[in-house]
Amino acid sequence: SCMKAAPMKEVGVRGQGSLAYPGLRTQGNLETLSGPNDATRGLTSLADTFEHVIEELLDEQQAIQPSKENKDADLYSTRVMLSSQVPLEPPLLFLLEEYKNYLDAANMSXRVRRHSDPARRGELSVCDSTSEWVTAAEKKTAVDMSGATVTVLEKVPVPKGQLKQYFYETKCSSKGYAKEGCRGIDKRYWNSQCRTTQSFVRALTMDNKKRVGWRFIRIDTSC
């Protein structure tokens, strides 16, 4: 599946409607620069700033993740969110993990990593996928680790009321190239098929005996 860039880190600055990033000037844009050399330097500075922000966010992620001694550590999942409304963006920690996995796999210097990004080289994924937030009301049921079908509860009680469970699911796209098999496979010699794969996440569920509890359930996570 294609990797998405994590959003920039927002910081407070003076001025109306201003959104700034560490080390980046908040006034002017690339169109107002004096010449092509300045534009090139501006783009390079922006790329360096982006990578610097990502590294800061990754460091913060390690700090906020629950430790092994925490009794609630097994409830941690990047694809599950408790919220009063539908999340507008993919989960930040999920994006950071994908970016970190890419950097670890690349095992290259920062500048080489940036220029080797598949998105920069115009590469395409083998299978096209789509990702979206799904509510428990839409899922209704799921399969747990024991193979039993359980009911996914729509709301989770919290001290100040209730929050809805949302799941960030990724599955193969029903449109386009996926119907013709995997991209890049020679169809003269090989048959291929894009399939949605699943992973386990922790969710509040109820079994057929009306017992409510946190269980690992399967959701669509990749193509």
UniProtKB/Swiss-Prot annotation:
Q: What does the sequence similarity comment in the record state about its family?
A: Belongs to the NGF-beta family.
UniProt propeptide residues: 6-114
**Primary role:** Promotes the survival of neuronal populations that are all located either in the central nervous system or directly connected to it.
- BP GO annotations: cell surface receptor protein tyrosine kinase signaling pathway; modulation of chemical synaptic transmission; negative regulation of neuron apoptotic process; nerve development; nerve growth factor signaling pathway; neuron projection morphogenesis
Q: What does the UniProt keyword field contain?
A: Cleavage on pair of basic residues, Disulfide bond, Glycoprotein, Growth factor, Secreted, Signal
Protein's recorded name: Neurotrophic factor BDNF precursor form
Residues of this chain annotated as glycosylated in UniProt: N107
Q: For this UniProt entry, what is the primary localization, expressed as one broad class?
A: secreted
Superkingdom, taxonomy of origin: Eukaryota
SMART domains cross-referenced by the UniProt entry: NGF (SM00140)
Species per Swiss-Prot/TrEMBL record:
Eryx jayakari (Arabian sand boa)
PANTHER family found in the cross-reference section: BRAIN-DERIVED NEUROTROPHIC FACTOR, NERVE GROWTH FACTOR NGF -RELATED
Localization per record? Secreted
The signal peptide annotation in the UniProt record is: 1-5
Task: Please list the disulfide bridges.
Answer: C127-C194, C172-C223
- GO CC term (a single one): synaptic vesicle
